[in-house]
């Protein structure tokens, strides 16, 4: 379970197989990896859906009492078991003491968000004063863009990756429209090279170098929602700032997935949601980051009561005393029930640590990649077997836990057959199925079972064809 820092996941799998005197695809390898996994007990902190409860399942094909193979934490994380307890604490407080709950208890409602910010700082690599928990991701993105995007006649572009997540795309379009700018001229999108699925860092840096003088803001994903590509955040940040650009990131698919060091990397601003890898539930409270170097120079364009210093907030004299930095961007009081959900998950992250989770994730996803390539790589095409292509980068530093896979047979059919058998993943246009083994609650045996099911489905498709 503890490969050297120089050992690739495939080498680890093969080494363990040799030690066990079995083939690398043998179930014993998965069981051994789980036995050696020091994080395996964290799975017990989550509710794992039962196969029998999932709507698409065909009960004639499965053991209904088994747990589902849940590989969709990149869309919605599983529920931490402590969520219900924490929600009941606040509901009970509301019932018993009503308005006094604003100021007393484990989570005084007026500072509920602040009570858990300390648990977030190591996940994103920031100081507490650089983080605010508020709103939803796109709302925060708009609030930050209103302050960071100040176009001039010479510097008026926003640089982003082509096929960014639709909400980011729409947000950027509307920000440009707000300033009366021509979208085609001002929205600079970088596309992969012909015949490639992902972006090369050298191509991103070349565009920044050549066009940086006309770019006001660079806004990239930390991890791309479709391809699973993990962008080189420090390199993009350094290059952009060297050309005078502000550099921000949408970390929806990066936070809780890969290690982040936003402060040390000098990132100007960032936003993230909490319902994917952070397991805070659908619509969970989102997060925002502004580097401390901007605390006294970047001000919110839109202000609310909760951006006012708490010490004088209740003077009610309507004389704004703005909190420096990102906390000054807070508009309304924190939704305490959403805080509870996030709190339950962040406590687990605190115990597990991002460094340990990332180490497991590299091996967990690497094991998945190894089994897929062994069974259905491109070199199998000569055998007329269906081919499974992984479009996510193979270098571990260029991806998180997600692999996006395509098939030489209709992916809709493969997806439906996986769902019937209790596998929870998703398909995304144009033709990908996203599979994300999450180190907090997925096991190596989950990966083994998934690839076995995939093999039986594809073998069946081969027979039909």
Swiss-Prot record:
Entry keyword set: Acetylation, Cytoplasm, Disease variant, Hydrolase, Pyridine nucleotide biosynthesis, Pyridoxal phosphate
Induction of expression: Increased levels in several cerebral and systemic inflammatory conditions.
Binding site for pyridoxal 5'-phosphate: 137-138, 165-168, 221, 250, 253, 275, 305, 333
Residues with N6-(pyridoxal phosphate)lysine modification: 276
Pathway: Amino-acid degradation; L-kynurenine degradation; L-alanine and anthranilate from L-kynurenine: step 1/1; Cofactor biosynthesis; NAD(+) biosynthesis; quinolinate from L-kynurenine: step 2/3
Localisation per UniProt entry: Cytoplasm, Cytosol
Tissue expression pattern: Expressed in all tissues tested (heart, brain placenta, lung, liver, skeletal muscle, kidney and pancreas). Highest levels found in placenta, liver and lung. Expressed in all brain regions.
GO CC, one annotated term: nucleoplasm
Molecular functions (GO terms): kynureninase activity; protein homodimerization activity; pyridoxal phosphate binding
Any coiled-coil regions, as ranges: none
HAMAP family: Kynureninase
NCBIfam families membership: kynureninase
Function in brief: Catalyzes the cleavage of L-kynurenine (L-Kyn) and L-3-hydroxykynurenine (L-3OHKyn) into anthranilic acid (AA) and 3-hydroxyanthranilic acid (3-OHAA), respectively. Has a preference for the L-3-hydroxy form. Also has cysteine-conjugate-beta-lyase activity.
Name this polypeptide is given: Kynureninase
Gene source species: Homo sapiens
């Amino acid at each position: 379970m503890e490969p050297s820092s120089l050992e690739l996941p495939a080498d680890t799998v093969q080494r363990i197989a040799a030690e066990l005197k079995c083939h690398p695809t043998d179930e014993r390898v998965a069981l051994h990896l789980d036995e050696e996994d020091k994080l395996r007990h964290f799975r017990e902190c989550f509710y794992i859906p039962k196969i029998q409860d999932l709507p698409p399942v065909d009960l004639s094909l499965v053991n209904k009492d088994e747990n589902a193979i849940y590989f969709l934490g990149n869309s919605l994380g599983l529920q931490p078991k402590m969520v219900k307890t924490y929600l009941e604490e606040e509901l009970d407080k509301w019932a018993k003491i009503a308005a006094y709950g604003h100021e007393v208890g484990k989570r005084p409602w007026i500072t509920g968000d602040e009570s858990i910010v300390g648990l977030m700082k190591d996940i994103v690599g920031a100081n507490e004063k650089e983080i605010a928990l508020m709103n939803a991701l796109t709302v925060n993105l708009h609030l930050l863009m209103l302050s960071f995007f100040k176009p001039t006649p010479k510097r008026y572009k926003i640089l982003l990756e082509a096929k960014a997540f639709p909400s980011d795309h729409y947000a950027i379009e509307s920000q440009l429209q707000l300033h009366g700018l021509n979208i085609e001229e001002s929205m600079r999108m970088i596309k992969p090279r012909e015949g490639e699925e992902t972006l090369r860092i050298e191509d991103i840096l070349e565009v920044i170098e050549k066009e940086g003088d006309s770019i006001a803001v660079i806004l990239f994903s930390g991890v791309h929602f479709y391809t699973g590509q993990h962008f080189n955040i420090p390199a993009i940040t350094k290059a952009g700032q060297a050309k005078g650009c502000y550099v921000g990131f949408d970390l929806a698919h990066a936070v809780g997935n890969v290690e982040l060091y936003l402060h040390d990397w000098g990132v100007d601003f960032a936003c993230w949601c909490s319902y994917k890898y952070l397991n805070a539930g659908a619509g969970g409270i989102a997060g925002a980051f502004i580097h401390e170097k901007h605390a006294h120079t970047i001000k919110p364009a839109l202000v609310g009561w909760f951006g006012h210093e708490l010490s004088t907030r209740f003077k009610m004299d309507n004389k704004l005393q703005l909190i420096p930095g990102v906390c000054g961007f807070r508009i309304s009081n924190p939704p305490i029930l959403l805080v509870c959900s996030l709190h339950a998950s962040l406590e687990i992250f605190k115990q597990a640590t991002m460094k340990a989770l990332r180490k497991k994730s590299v091996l967990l996803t690497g094991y998945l990649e190894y089994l897929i390539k062994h069974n259905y790589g491109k070199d199998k095409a000569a055998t007329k077997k269906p081919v499974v292509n992984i479009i996510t980068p193979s270098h571990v530093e260029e991806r998180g836990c997600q692999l996006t896979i395509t098939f030489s047979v209709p992916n809709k059919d493969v997806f439906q057959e996986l769902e019937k058998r209790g596998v929870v993943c998703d398909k995304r246009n144009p033709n990908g199925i996203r599979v994300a083994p999450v180190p907090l609650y997925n096991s190596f045996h989950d990966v083994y079972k998934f690839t076995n099911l995939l093999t039986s489905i594809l073998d069946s498709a081969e027979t039909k064809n």
